[in-house]
Amino acid sequence: MTDPAPPPTALAAAKARMRELAASYGAGLPGRDTHSLMHGLDGITLTFMPMGQRDGAYDPEHHVILINSQVRPERQRFTLAHEISHALLLGDDDLLSDLHDEYEGDRLEQVIETLCNVGAAALLMPAELIDDLLTRFGPTGRALAELARRADVSATSALYALAERTAPPVIYAVCALSRQEDEGEGGGAKELTVRASSASAGVKYSLSAGTPVPDDHPAALALDTRLPLAQDSYVPFRSGRRMPAYVDAFPERQRVLVSFALPAGRSEPDADKPEAPGDQS
């Protein structure tokens, strides 16, 4: 018989502590550019080099952070913040002790990686910045676009951070055109699909990656016209079910950033829920 899984509060407490570490570290930085991010790590050097499929690594024995020089700048930036979070975590004996008490093996490694993502998000996207954008723009596609731009991170990274700070029941999504598989010559036609999705606390489902967005949906119309669009519409679940929502779609280059504000009382799934909890990428 295996031991019961640790209660969710253990991970929640660890995430809260990781955010505190990142916020404290970030408060002492002169800026958020690449070299300023390293300012608080005495004796640790930063090296960019080709790393194949790896984004980066932190080597505490040799006091060096390695970043893949062949990936996009915004990915390098998030990876750097992730590796800095590894250094911060290793410097907190109490947090390390708590983690080893609660987890072991592969699960311990998974939790550590999760915490370093939490730390990276808190470092690059401080709560004050997110709250300011939510105050100015509300929980909208525009807020998501502004967060990604001002924090200089990918829209996918931004949507998870924005969802965590959003109080009302809202689903966020990054959508882009993708070519559908087709056995005919020239391949299939392009279709707007969900690339990533996350929801605010209390919303037990989100949109699966690859979910198609109908051509007449506000998100598709916004991308087609290159104009922001906000109106009453629906969440287009892959199952075909449509949940009423106020849709705010903000087109940006070849993608559209979308928020789905759910009606009050619809944040909990019912017996005919459209998507499995956590079904996202």
Swiss-Prot record:
PANTHER family: ANTITOXIN HIGA1, BLL0069 PROTEIN
Catalytic residues (UniProt): 83
Gene name for this UniProt entry: irrE
Knocked-out gene: effects: Deletion mutant is radiosensitive.
Subunit composition and interactions: Interacts with DdrOC.
Keyword Metal-binding: yes
Alphabetic keyword roster: Hydrolase, Metal-binding, Metalloprotease, Protease, Stress response, Zinc
InterPro entries named among the record's database cross-references: G3DSA:1.10.10.1030 (IPR044853), IrrE_HExxH (IPR010359), Rad_response_metalloprotease (IPR052345)
Activation/inhibition comment: Protease activity is inhibited by EDTA.
Protein name according to UniProt: Radiation response metalloprotease IrrE
Single GO MF annotation: metal ion binding
Binding site for Zn(2+): 82, 86, 113
Natural source organism: Deinococcus deserti (strain DSM 17065 / CIP 109153 / LMG 22923 / VCD115)
Basic and acidic residues composition bias: residue spans: 267-281
A biological process from GO: proteolysis
Record flagged with keyword Metal-binding: yes
UniProt EC number: 3.4.24.-
Span list, region Disordered: 262-281
UniProt function note: Plays a central regulatory role in DNA repair and protection pathways in response to radiation stress. Acts as a site-specific metalloprotease that cleaves and inactivates the repressor proteins DdrOC and DdrOP3, resulting in induced expression of genes required for DNA repair and cell survival after exposure to radiation.
Annotated domain remarks: Composed of three structural domains: an N-terminal zinc-peptidase domain, a central helix-turn-helix motif, and a C-terminal GAF-type domain.
